[in-house]
């Protein structure tokens, strides 16, 4: 396979994995208090640029197939895209890169949760709940994903 095909394939696998993990773990992936385990994949833009659109597509698929309202589909996907772009831009600054999904999803998805699902819960609390779940996925699980992917021989990743 040529490089373009490999890149496209890696992106498709990342998108599918994100959507599948989110849907399989739906009870904890959606709602006021959520830990979206698939968000551990948000470390991948550090290693590969194709992960940026792949994560956004995976999030879009998970939110559409998960039955989310349009407001959540649009702004949840936007939060993931912005976080992935910033993670990629900050790839040489690991701590800052890992914090981007926590920041963007905490603010944007926290607002979505408040306005779409839980208007009785104060907005700052919704943001805090989402950021806490993101922290578990991105700051605890993300480095494990990063370490595992780094162990894959480079010729297998970038053939």
Residue ranges and their predicted role:
Residues 27-32, 40, 60-159:
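Membrane-embedded alpha-helical hairpins and interfacial helices in multi-pass inner-membrane proteins
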Residues 1-4, 56, 119-120, 124:
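Juxtamembrane loop-helix boundary motifs flanking transmembrane segments in multi-pass membrane proteins
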Residues 1-53:
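Hydrophobic transmembrane alpha-helices
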């Amino acid at each position: 396979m040529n490089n373009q095909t490999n890149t496209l394939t890696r992106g498709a696998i990342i998108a599918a994995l994100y959507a599948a993990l989110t849907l399989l773990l739906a009870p904890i992936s959606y709602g006021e208090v959520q830990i979206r385990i698939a968000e551990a994949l948000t470390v991948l833009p550090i290693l590969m640029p194709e992960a940026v659109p792949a994560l956004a597509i995976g999030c879009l698929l998970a939110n559409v197939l998960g039955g989310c309202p349009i407001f959540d589909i649009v702004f949840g996907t936007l939060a993931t895209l912005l976080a992935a772009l910033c993670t990629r831009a900050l790839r040489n600054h690991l701590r800052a890169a890992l914090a981007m999904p926590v920041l963007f999803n905490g603010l944007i998805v926290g607002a979505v949760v408040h306005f779409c699902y839980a208007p009785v819960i104060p907005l700052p609390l919704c943001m805090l709940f989402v950021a806490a779940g993101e922290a578990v996925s991105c700051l605890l699980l993300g480095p494990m994903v990063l370490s595992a992917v780094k162990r894959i021989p480079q010729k297998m990743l970038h053939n």
